[in-house]
Amino acid sequence: MKTRMIIVAAPSGAGKSSFVERITREDSRLVDIVTFTTRSIRQGETPGLQYNFIDHADFEQKIKEGFFVEWAKVHTNFYGTSYSSLETAWNQGKTAIMDIDIQGVATFKSKFPDAKTVFIHPPSIDELRRRIEKRDGKVPADIEVRMANAEKEIREASKFDYQIVNDVFEKSYGEFKKIVEDLLA
């Protein structure tokens, strides 16, 4: 039986969004679940494509309304996944795939034990730092928070069903694609 939910997690800057965005373009059996966030939009992002961007007050109201399957405060912003986005994917007969933070993975696994999880490792902590520093608008304090969180997240990787090191993107993506294809068979 094919998997109904694939969860991809990684430290910020390890490549999880790139993997998920590409595989959903290439495989029509998948729907990328777009999460909600209170963080600022980055250059090149389109609202509703990478994230649904909302302010803190709206996010907190949605929490009270029970709108989210899971939500978490990551770094200094909120992120959450709506029930309706999953229901829409499943009603279309598709597998939901999403990139979320480590906190969200535990919540999803408690509610959906059959969900499959993939952890994307950076090639090294130094390379991860370089990738994060290269992003627009990162202040040193934010970089340090992300690096501290990354070390904690990497320690959780053994709890995942699959692990990939994103050292050479095409090779790593090929490994990821094979895992997803096997889960959809």
Swiss-Prot record:
GO terms for molecular function: ATP binding; guanylate kinase activity. Residues 3-181 form the Guanylate kinase-like domain. InterPro entries: GK/Ca_channel_bsu (IPR008145), Guanylate_kin-like_dom (IPR008144), Guanylate_kinase (IPR017665), Guanylate_kinase_CS (IPR020590), P-loop_NTPase (IPR027417). The keyword Zinc does not apply. It is found in: Cytoplasm. It catalyses: GMP + ATP = GDP + ADP. Its EC number is 2.7.4.8. Essential for recycling GMP and indirectly, cGMP. Belongs to the guanylate kinase family. This is Guanylate kinase. It comes from Bdellovibrio bacteriovorus (strain ATCC 15356 / DSM 50701 / NCIMB 9529 / HD100).
